[in-house]
């Protein structure tokens, strides 16, 4: 049974009626929780200013010859370099110089001045650290002293999470095809709550990382399966808008991270509160039906018919008999077309030199989109000003970006919108690098422009990739692009960590990649107004048609766009934030 025949059901019961809208917003609400967990480490993994803890009780503190400080307050005064230190006198008369990762004991106990040229002996920070608590009372870093020689453990918090995202998207996508969408939705959402709470109550670093890893797997699994679930209930006339705007709910999660981080400054309480966002979905997800698409593929025709009847009743429409509409063979499960069951490996994406260039360009765009998306978000704490407001604003601009994509891609074309979005992102990165840090407001505004542009590109690449390849490898093309995207999301935190070497390294990486991707995008064929390719010959013809640039205006743009969305079956689609 082809997707075109299945669309006949929606012609009877409605493409996006009341039934589909209720399901859509229930499932989209859980995307908010996924967005929360993807970016929770922006604040949970913050490394506050700190100094080594002295080996005894302090009687006096000196910093740059000013002595009216408490030791807890001086941490915020240290520069990012290692040369600054705090001089303290202990109650036993010893004088120590405390820096970020070491401490020195002065041999001459009569000199408490900041400048000291006498002999001193260096000791490691075996007594722990004193952290600045003006911004955060505690973070995962302060909980387990992930600084200095243990700093690399803190750097793994977000990359390991993204590695879990990579595995989860593959694992749960497989399970949903075997066990059904409904079961996996319930299992992943329940597990998100359990692993989220487990991370908050972790007794050590390794338990915390394990809980976060499994949290990432189930969150990613939900995003993939939830996307397929809602797309299998929505008809072709609404599928493009509905699929793109699922990203908007993910962006709302970013807003909640910023708001919760501002209100709650203790990491485990922050994590617990964020984890409760998934509770409303857990309470109602058990009433969600299985999709008729999956039921039919399993030969469960009576159950599929019941769901279609319920859809028609909710939508106040007339139902239809699946056996007549789809000409079902009631003796066995619905079979796919030969091209759908035919297996293809990655080498098919390098069918010839033309397709090879197309594949490498598409992969680069996926990589750039993900790298830019997470670099802008994770780097919000380095923009200056209020870091919570920065992240909030960077999340807000995503929502109009997806609306812009939905409108612009059918007006001026996929390739044009994608290329100029990448160029705009590259330009924003370049402008941020030349803005003096004292003008941080201008820097934040420019970063918002960059996030808007990269969000638009990121939202468009899913559909554009599917339109560039023939049916026999379409799912493989989107899936491989999604995998490249997730590899970039693993590397993005390391790029942000390099800002300690030079604060603009993330912008340099993203800007360079976006500029290169934009140039190469202009070499791709335009797919607006063209039917989806079903063979390699038709896919290659896209390129020749692009070069010829026929002057004939395509009057059926909107209809053909709908046909493309129809032909991209939910099984071909994937969601990889």
UniProtKB/Swiss-Prot annotation:
GO terms for cellular component: cytosol; membrane; plasma membrane. Keywords: Cell membrane, Developmental protein, Differentiation, Glycoprotein, Ion transport, Membrane, Spermatogenesis, Transmembrane, Transmembrane helix, Transport. SUPFAM superfamilies: MFS general substrate transporter (SSF103473). InterPro entries: MFS_dom, MFS_sugar_transport-like, MFS_trans_sf. It comes from the Eukaryota. It is a multi-pass membrane protein. GO terms for molecular function: amine transmembrane transporter activity; carnitine transmembrane transporter activity; organic cation transmembrane transporter activity; spermidine transmembrane transporter activity. The chain crosses the membrane at residues 23-43, 152-172, 183-203, 214-234, 244-264, 268-288, 359-379, 389-409, 416-436, 441-461, 476-496, 501-521. Expressed in testis and epididymis (at protein level). Expressed in endometrium (at protein level); highly expressed during the normal secretory phase, but expression is significantly reduced in the proliferative phase. Expressed at lower levels in adult tissues including bone marrow (at protein level). Expressed in hematopoietic cells, including CD34(+) leukocytes. Expressed in fetal liver (at protein level), brain, lung, kidney, heart, skeletal muscle, spleen and thymus. Expressed in leukemia cells. Abundantly expressed in ovarian cancer clear-cell adenocarcinoma. Optimum pH is 8.5 for carnitine uptake and transport efficiency decreased at more acidic pHs. CDD domains: MFS_SLC22A16_CT2 (cd17375). Facilitative organic cation transporter that mediates the transport of carnitine as well as the polyamine spermidine. Mediates the partially Na(+)-dependent bidirectional transport of carnitine. May mediate L-carnitine secretion from testis epididymal epithelium into the lumen which is involved in the maturation of spermatozoa. Belongs to the major facilitator (TC 2.A.1) superfamily. Organic cation transporter (TC 2.A.1.19) family. Involved in the uptake of clinically used drugs such as anticancer agents doxorubicin and bleomycin. This is Solute carrier family 22 member 16. It comes from Homo sapiens (Human). The lineage of its organism: Eukaryota, Metazoa, Chordata, Craniata, Vertebrata.
